[in-house]
Amino acid sequence: MKKELLKKIYSEIKKYDLIYIVRHIGPDPDAISSQIALRDSIKYTFPDKKVYAFGASVSKFKYIGHIDKSMDYDYENALVITLDIPNKSRIDGLNVDKFKHVIKIDHHPFVENFGGIEYIDEKACSTCEILLDLINNTRLKMNESIARTLMIGIISDSNRFLFNPVNENIFFKVGNLVKKYKLNLQDIYSSIYMKPMSEVRLMGYIASNMKVTKNKFAYIILENDIVNSFNADASSASNMVNDFSNIDEFVVWLFVTYDAKNDLYKVNIRSRGPVINEIAAKYNGGGHKFSSGARVKTMSELDDLIL
């Protein structure tokens, strides 16, 4: 943790009356939770500031909070804070190159500079953990709602504290958070992991139809008509990749879904050993060493990635 840099970020936040907070395309709970928690903390601390969280809303994650509608941007006077994004091409909601004032906060390996203050902590289990550090080490305020939102991001991105990096520090921080704000962990876990029977049936289909190679690599291409037949959507199907992390027969697994709106294939990749983010980076993606995503336009590109 770099306390002086956290204080510098707080000083920058204090300067600006207009703040835009953005995260990556195809968001997960950590990305959305970090947006909402930071927006709400800044507004709670500075009620007169105009603070917005931008990006496509995802119905599956409405329980976390609301995303603001896009607007005409003030490129000269606004401060942009990017969260959970290592590269510009994955920013959802705006073109960061058009803005004069930018802060980047992330826990992924460094890919490129965004042109302003950069706070990257690869030892953090989530971007929400970094924001917890930011609030704990500055005069930003927190309430029970903000604390709950941060917990959602921390729990989900660490997969219930199973994924590295997880160490004694995060348990100390989370313990204090639960104690101070009397958080209901059972309620939080239910919000994250409760799912309808239709999704469980889809998981059964996936388990029955995944292809597994002799090299312990598993993959499945989930066409939308199959997903829809289970009353699920592509986003929900894609996020099920995390539910297959403890299967002995494979160490790397990959889910493919089709994004009809953007006419491309979304690829979620997970690993229990081999480093995968370097491969994902070659296909318009990236992420962590053992948890990454990619986006490809054609079936030929998809075949290259898989094979």
Regions found by a protein language model. Name each.
Residues Y73-D74, N95-D97, V111-E112, M142-E144, ...:
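Solvent-exposed alpha-helices and their adjacent loops that cap or buttress functional pockets
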Residues K50-Y52, H101, E118, K141:
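Conserved beta-strand segments of alpha/beta enzyme cores
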Residues M1-K7, S89-I91, N95-V102, K123-L131:
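An acidic intrinsically disordered interaction segment
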Residues K2-I25, P29-K62, D72-L79, S156-I306:
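Hydrophobic helix-and-loop "lid/oligomerization" segment in the mid-to-C-terminal part
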Residues H107-K173:
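Short alpha-helices
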Residues Y63-I117:
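Active-site cofactor/cluster-binding pocket
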Residues L38-R39, D97-K100, I120-D121, F172:
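Glycine-rich, phosphate-binding/catalytic loops in enzymes
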